[in-house]
Amino acid sequence: MGMWEEASDTGMKGKKKDKNEEEEERGKKERMVNLTLEMIYLLTGEHYIPRKKSDDGGALHAPGSVIQKENNKNDKKILELMSNIIQLLTGEVAIRTHHVSIYFSLDEWDYIKGNKELYEEGIKEEPQQLRPQACEYKDESNVTAHMEATLCCNSDGNFINPENPEISPGEQPPPANGIKEEATSSEEGNQSDCSINPLTEEIQGTDTPTPIMGCSLNYSLSDNYISDEIKEEETSCQGRNQSDCSITPLTEQIQGTDTPTPIMGCSLKDNKYDGNPHWSPKNTLRRKYSCNECHEYLIHKRDFGKHQMTHKREKSFSCSECGKCFLNQLCPDRHQTGKKPFSCSKCGKCFAFLSDLTVHRRIHTGERPFSCSECGKGFTRPNALIIHHRTHTGEKPFSCSECGKCFSKQSSLVHHQRTHIGEKPFCCSECDKCFASSSELNIHQRTHTGEKPFSCSECGKCFTNHSHFAHHQMIHTGEKPFCCSKCGKCFASSSDLTFHRRTHTREKTFSCSECGKCFSNHSHLARHQMIHTGEKPFCCSECGKCFSSSSGLTAHQQRTHMKVKPFSCSACGKCFSNRSHLIRHQMIHTGEKPFSCFECRKCFSNPSNLARHQMTHTGEKPFSCSECGKCFASSSDLTFHHRTHTGEKPFSCSECGKCYSKKSSLVHHQRTHTGEKPFSCSKCDKCFASSSELNIHQRTHTGEKAFSCSECGKCFTNRSQLSRHQMIHTGEKPISCPECEECFVSSSQLTAHQQQAHRMVKPFSCLECGKCFSNRSNFARHQMIHTGEKPFSCSECRKGFSNQSSLARHQMTHTGEKPFSCSECGKRFSNQSHLARHQMIHTGEKPFSCSECAKGFSNQSGLARHQMTHTGEKPFACSECGKCFASSSKLTAHQRTH
């Protein structure tokens, strides 16, 4: 369109020259020009005609005549003309309130007329801002003079709908889609004194707002104001009459520059403006204004004032269902109804607001217009860039009033504050489980649907959420970007690093409200609390067995039903159902024990063993048995103990059918069938079926006796020996015979009693002499008589013994130690059995009687020797002369004759 120029009343000749052009430009364009000329005449009293530029690029100007207009009549006429222009361009109806011009489609206007009460309060919300992204122009002389228009009020201060003057615009309801606004302000003078703003409108079928007159502008809605989808532009008029206002190009100072730039009349090419006060393309941002509420920095005073209003605005519109508050009436309506009128043409996904759809489309196009000046990373939203920028600056402007913890995002603070108040507003419709955030609810709902939308391109494994997927991919890449400043150890995720750092500080910020136990991370606390509640939400679809964690369910399914063990050890070929078990196993080969006790510096291969060990220092036993009140350091120990009351033995051997209460006991038993002894001593190369046996054996080389009795100070190489010893002081005999109810200190004593007194089976028989034994240890000890093996030797005299207890008794002859004393006569003995035998002299007790002659004996060996007089058995033969004897002592005495 040619430039607008003033002309006098005598300039009618120009109109005649343009008749040919007007005939060619019929239709909507001609109508818009005529309506605009008429509107300018009503506003200024001057005639304007369109003319082409002169050859030298100058604009022809002719002074026009000025007339006195009647304001009230003209205002109404201007409203009608403006409405006609808008309808010609967009098919929308415009109304004017006290502060904003708002544009509605014809369908929306029908809705407004039927629901005016709902709109009366909603229209009072503060409008949001639509900003131009950038502006470039070569020559200001090439820029057309800009048409500016503002809908004005009548003399009574009321604004009239041109389609229906009887309806006040202030009574209109909100439209079904986004609202476009154009805000004005007047400081001195009346409404008619306001300057004239460029009219912008979003052309239907496009995504970007376009000015009605002037040039084509590229606008982007600032994501800081997307919630209401309101677009605005501010102007002010400093107390002038409307007739004095000149029609000048509306300028906007683009952030990051120092010169005002015309908004209209040029073609915008640079789309790098992102509305982010922290960033400018040339990194020349001047931070003039700082918000005391959220520490946000802004360049312009006008933007600073607007930003502060976001803190002052009340969210007066609340949802009747959940109580959530919103800034305007439109948001709770969409929130309650779930209406999403804006759909993506690519994937069909729907959105409640047009701005959300605009941002979503960038996923398909790959457009990331907002880039970080530090690292170059791109983002689809400017607020995402602002949040990202804080990772470089370390800024965390949002702090919790309860604990003082700081966050870089407002949403993170809100989510954190729910941990203090316990609020979980998002509930699952399937199982009624509630969550603190909608994202957690969405991830949880996938456990019901089984949806795993994130799949790994390397191994095909699928995940329910993107964070797990990203964490998994680092396994393939080996990337560990998060390093500990204390020890230099690196991790794949920041959460793993945070958890690791607590091993240095020993910080345990999460405590159980039931028992007071503290944990270093929230997931461990949640898992622990299920012990108190008994909750096991993860059930196996095959057998119905329930678990407290999804990892437990997965391990169960792989181990029991699928029997899949995809993780194999490269050293020994052993397979495992999950990676953590493989990593723990590999530490056996490497000898790595990264977890050390702060008290005694003892090291462990996994944190659970360390935690269990630390309870030996603190004496803490938080898990108590409901049957007998006995306390335990771990829940697994309590579970094993419960089985002594119930008699449950869920683990059975496939070879012989023998059952066990613990899986480890079954594994140890199965090695008796396979003969496997994977644990070998580095000193003597002796092999053992379990690591505990190896540890006990290694103490014979080191002489270490780590377990000491608090009563008498006696030391033992393993805990079981100490426990058995302590029963001497306490008199406790927890194992009872079901036949005669006699009590014993250990299960081995009970077994021996049952075999002797109740004629139980003795499955282990000696191939040399045919003697039978009830347990393997006694059988192994007996075989040493035939082989002559004596693996335990005295360090003083080098005398050998077939078992460690005999060696211990012998060593007391060198030390002279006799810790057991008789309460009757004070005589002391080197071992408990000798004391017990001696005490029978005082009591006269002879519990062992001969079945042949009923003679009584105080000990079993005396009875055995006596029975040989009835049978005539003489098992001990002299190797020199072949003479036989009933006892080894007599054989020894005889051998001295040779």
UniProtKB/Swiss-Prot annotation:
GO terms for molecular function: DNA-binding transcription factor activity, RNA polymerase II-specific; RNA polymerase II cis-regulatory region sequence-specific DNA binding; zinc ion binding. Residues 1-30, 160-211 are annotated as: Disordered. It is found in: Nucleus. Its main location: nucleus. GO terms for biological process: regulation of DNA-templated transcription. It holds the Pfam family zf-C2H2. The keyword Transcription regulation applies. SUPFAM superfamilies: beta-beta-alpha zinc fingers. GO terms for cellular component: nucleus. Residues 186-209 have a biased composition (Polar residues). It comes from the Eukaryota. Keywords: DNA-binding, Metal-binding, Nucleus, Repeat, Transcription, Transcription regulation, Zinc, Zinc-finger. A zinc finger (C2H2-type) spans 289-311, 342-364, 370-392, 398-420, 426-448, 454-476, 482-504, 510-532, 538-561, 567-589, 595-617, 623-645, 651-673, 679-701, 707-729, 735-758, 764-786, 792-814, 820-842, 848-870, 876-898. May be involved in transcriptional regulation. Belongs to the krueppel C2H2-type zinc-finger protein family. This is Oocyte zinc finger protein XlCOF7.1. It comes from Xenopus laevis (African clawed frog). The lineage of its organism: Eukaryota, Metazoa, Chordata, Craniata, Vertebrata.
